């Protein structure tokens, strides 16, 4: 396991920049997606800040640009804001599954079968598949036990270059401990602290 700052850079990508600068650049380079981000915030569909949402959208778009194999997956969606952003950032052909108890806002904002989004109701600890490649995973879970289950089932499925994003790593101690315990001593993963923690498969 290695922790380092992200030093990857290429045209169109937003790396190594402050939150405000990231938002400004994203709004210019990706105006359509930026409007989705602003809509989600205006409707109060997420507690995630604007910079983190822009970073999430850019990560999904970078994965599409790189042509990585694998599905997108989110576990825990709250009011659905982050899932809506991911759904609009990805290509329509990419399968995106959302695991949570309910997700009433997703379909209302186009994040349904029209964008190849599949909602899987129920406790995600019980509904997650144990196989299948994943290119992007977004985890919104603050408790130790459920987070360990998510990591054990999902991290091994990441493709090379895939991202597992942990929303609550900085703010919730149980989440942080679960992540640190799981990845301690594990090879093949980079832990990069951006606005959220990104775990990238080598």
Where are these regions (language model features)?
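Conserved alpha-helix/loop element of class I SAM-dependent methyltransferases that forms part
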Residues: 53-68
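S-adenosylmethionine/decaboxylated-SAM
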Residues: 19, 23-47, 66-202
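Short alpha-helical patches at coil-to-helix transitions and adjacent helical residues
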Residues: 49, 53-56, 83
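Generic N-terminal initiation segments characterized by hydrophobic and/or small/turn-forming residues
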Residues: 11, 50-53, 155
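N-terminal auxiliary segments of SAM/dcSAM-dependent transferases
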Residues: 1-23
């Amino acid at each position: 396991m290695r922790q380092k700052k992200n030093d990857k850079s290429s045209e169109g990508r937003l790396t190594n920049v402050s939150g405000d600068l990231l938002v400004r650049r994203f709004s210019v380079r990706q105006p359509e997606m930026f409007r989705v981000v602003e809509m989600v915030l205006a409707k109060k569909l997420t507690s995630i800040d604007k910079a983190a949402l822009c970073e999430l959208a850019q990560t999904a778009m970078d994965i599409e640009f790189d042509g990585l194999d694998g599905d997108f997956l989110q576990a825990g969606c709250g009011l659905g804001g982050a899932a809506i952003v991911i759904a609009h950032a990805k290509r329509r052909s990419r399968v995106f599954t959302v695991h949570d108890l309910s997700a009433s806002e997703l379909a209302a904002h186009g994040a349904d079968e029209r964008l190849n989004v599949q909602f899987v109701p129920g406790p995600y600890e019980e509904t997650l598949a144990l196989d299948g490649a994943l290119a992007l995973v977004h985890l919104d879970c603050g408790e130790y036990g459920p987070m360990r289950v998510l990591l054990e089932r999902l991290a091994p499925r990441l493709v090379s270059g895939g991202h597992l994003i942990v929303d609550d790593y900085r703010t919730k101690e149980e989440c942080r401990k679960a992540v640190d315990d799981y990845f301690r001593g594990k090879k093949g993963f980079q832990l990069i602290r951006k606005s959220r923690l990104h775990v990238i498969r080598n």
